[in-house]
Regions:
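Conserved AdoMet/S-adenosylmethionine-binding subsite of the radical SAM
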Residues: 1-119, 125
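C-terminal accessory region of radical SAM enzymes
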Residues: 76, 142-159
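A structural motif corresponding to the C-terminal lobe/cap of the Radical SAM core domain
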Residues: 99, 105, 109, 124-150
Length: 159
């Protein structure tokens, strides 16, 4: 509710709005709230349910549903996909993510392929939550190039 009030006030002042989300709270966003979103940075963590759950503790479907709602509402989407070696970098997973993105149609302006990093680790420690990616390394250039090309093969602009 707080974000929607801020976005509504911003729109009244003519300010561009951008929601950064995994889409997990899909059903908490009413269609009326969607009206005040100009752009959504939508994190699609994985195209595989089991991997998605391992990375987030949640389920994939709310992210898909939210992306489809955004597309139906005519909102622009920048999909963000984090490349985690040995976890999200398989060809099959990337194909699944590409198919999810295709279900959003022309709403997807581009896909950002982001290399995994450990900058969030202190947050997990501070919250005293076990960090499942504690010893995870970041990607090297080879899988990043393959993943980028896989998305491009589906017609997406990729950064």
């Amino acid at each position: 509710a707080f974000v929607s009030r801020v976005f509504h006030a911003a729109k009244e002042m003519g300010v561009h709005t951008c929601l950064d989300t995994s889409g997990f709270l899909n059903t908490n966003y009413t269609d009326e709230m969607l009206e005040d979103i100009d752009l959504c940075l939508l994190d699609v963590k994985s195209g595989d349910e089991e991997t998605y759950h391992k990375v987030t503790g949640g389920t994939l479907q709310p992210t898909i549903d939210f992306g489809q709602r955004l597309a139906k509402a005519g909102k622009k989407i920048w999909v963000r996909f984090v490349l985690v070696p040995g976890l999200t970098d398989s060809e099959e997973n990337v194909e699944n993510v590409a198919k999810i993105c295709e279900s959003f149609g022309d709403a997807v302006e581009h896909i950002d392929v982001l290399g995994f990093h450990q900058l969030g680790r202190p947050k997990w420690h501070e919250l005293r939550i076990p960090y499942p990616l504690e010893n995870q390394k970041g990607p090297n250039a080879a899988p990043r190039e393959r993943v980028t090309n896989q998305f491009k093969d589906h017609g997406f602009t990729v950064y």
